[in-house]
Curated annotation (Swiss-Prot):
PANTHER family: INTEGRAL MEMBRANE PROTEIN OF SOXR-REDUCING COMPLEX, ION-TRANSLOCATING OXIDOREDUCTASE COMPLEX SUBUNIT A. This is Ion-translocating oxidoreductase complex subunit A. Belongs to the NqrDE/RnfAE family. It is found in: Cell inner membrane. Coiled coil: none annotated. Its main location: membrane. InterPro entries: Ion_transpt_RnfA/RsxA (IPR011293), NqrDE/RnfAE (IPR003667), NqrDE/RnfAE_oxidrdctase (IPR050133). It is a multi-pass membrane protein. Its EC number is 7.-.-.-. Keywords: Cell inner membrane, Cell membrane, Electron transport, Membrane, Translocase, Transmembrane, Transmembrane helix, Transport. It comes from Actinobacillus pleuropneumoniae serotype 5b (strain L20). Part of a membrane-bound complex that couples electron transfer with translocation of ions across the membrane.
């Protein structure tokens, strides 16, 4: 049980996919202008990442390995992720039309979010079992959501701040992301595996 908690903590904080592995930067920079949108995107991505990790494990274990078709892994994972994202999009559209409008193009873009595919591929390469695969995906999703919401809150504060003209826009956003990455480096050594 402790190993599972450490797995979640290490994927969320220490090996954060956005700040350490630089995966998922497109939604990180694009959806992080308002906290409400970031929370919605974080929830949708959490669902997709967790289910995609489970699905990737099942497809790899029960379809690709028995058929000796591991060379199709990336293509099959992209198709599985696309199906999961479409289901998520339908659920969000039915349950929260406002959130659906706020997320706009970023919801279908979860399909091409490199973090989702990256987590699925890393899960397979790490040879995690079923529970570890789901927890790895969930921890990665928690880390993504945490960073996204924190970054959105910082960007809202920066929008109200008196930022010098050369640093306005993407410049201050990238500087802030770099400082967040440095702050998350403080978690290094938190978990010894």
């Amino acid at each position: 049980m402790v190993d599972y908690i450490l797995l979640i903590i290490s994927t969320a904080l220490i090996n954060n996919f956005v700040l350490v592995k630089f995966l998922g930067l497109c939604p990180f920079m694009g959806v992080s202008k308002k906290v409400e949108t970031a929370i919605g995107m974080g929830m949708a991505t959490t669902f997709v990442l967790t289910v995609a990790s489970l699905s990737a494990y099942l497809v790899e274990t029960y379809v690709l390995i028995p058929l000796e078709a591991q060379f199709l892994r990336t293509l099959v994972f992209i198709l599985v992720i696309a199906v999961i994202v479409q289901l998520t999009e339908m659920i969000v559209h039915k349950t929260s039309p406002t959130l659906y409008r706020l997320l706009g193009i970023y919801l279908p873009l979860i399909t091409t979010n490199c973090a989702v595919l990256g987590v699925a591929l890393l899960n397979v390469n790490l040879s995690n079992n079923l529970v570890e695969s789901v927890l790895y995906g969930f921890g990665a999703a928690l880390g993504f959501s945490l960073v996204l919401v924190l970054f959105a809150a910082l960007r809202e504060r920066l929008a109200a701040a008196d930022v010098p003209r050369p640093f306005q826009g993407a410049s201050i956003a990238l500087i802030t992301a770099g400082l967040m990455s440095l702050a998350f480096m403080g978690f290094t050594g938190l978990v010894k595996i």
